[in-house]
Amino acid sequence: MRQPGYKQFCPVAMASELLCTRWTMVLLRELISGSTRFNDLRRGVPRMSPTLLSRRLQELEAAGVVERKAAKGDRGVFEDHLTESGQELRTVVEAIGSWGQRRIDTRQSLKNVDPAFLMWDMRRKLSPSPPPDRRTVIQFSYPEVPAPMRCYWLVVEPHGEVDLCSADPGFEVDLYVSTDLRTMTAIWMGLTTLEQERAKVTLSGTPEAVRKMRAWLGFNRAGVEARRTFRLP
């Protein structure tokens, strides 16, 4: 049931009636990041119920923020794409993210660690440039996490396609990364660096594999600085 509006003519109030309902802003984050299919959107908001996700998408469609389209090449599959109106919200979402990055207490943000969301965020922001000349596999392990969500595999293909697996894909692993979830989340957010957390992170692989991981995931100095200002893919 939709909450009553603010009943003010102010544009901030009117926009807030749509954008500030529960889950809407993080759903927009996923849409702006490039997710268009229902299951991919769910991976970005794993704690959001499918029913509520469908409802929020319908509300955004009714407001002209997203447009539902048939997927090319997949009969019976539909996708939700941002309209021009929706694309204009990129700067709004990025501004909120940048403010949160600078102003929200680090200890508070690290209370909400989630391995599935962390790895999904890594997968969509991983930039394999230049792409490898052969398939490259990086396995991440979080020993303190229960078994079903303990290990993840990032698979980078020679043409640049990136896949995330939560079950062993059966490929040869080029680099093993083992650390606790809180540490990796802090590194990924740019709150600390791989060098500063060296005692907590175990890397097992060739120097070339380590170099690729650092470059692709932005674990170098430039990547850390970039993450201090929130940007979506």
Language-model segment annotations:
Residues 24, 68-69:
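A local structural micro-motif
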Residues 47, 52-67, 73-90, 94-233:
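Feature captures hydrophobic
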Residues 10-48:
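N-terminal helix-turn-helix DNA-binding core of bacterial DNA-binding proteins
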Residues 1, 28, 36, 41, ...:
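Short, intrinsically disordered low-complexity segments
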Residues 1-8:
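N-terminal intrinsically disordered/low-complexity leader segments
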Residues 7, 18, 68:
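Internal alpha/beta domain cores that form substrate/cofactor-binding pockets in large enzymes
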Residues 9-10, 178:
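A generic alpha-helix surface/boundary motif
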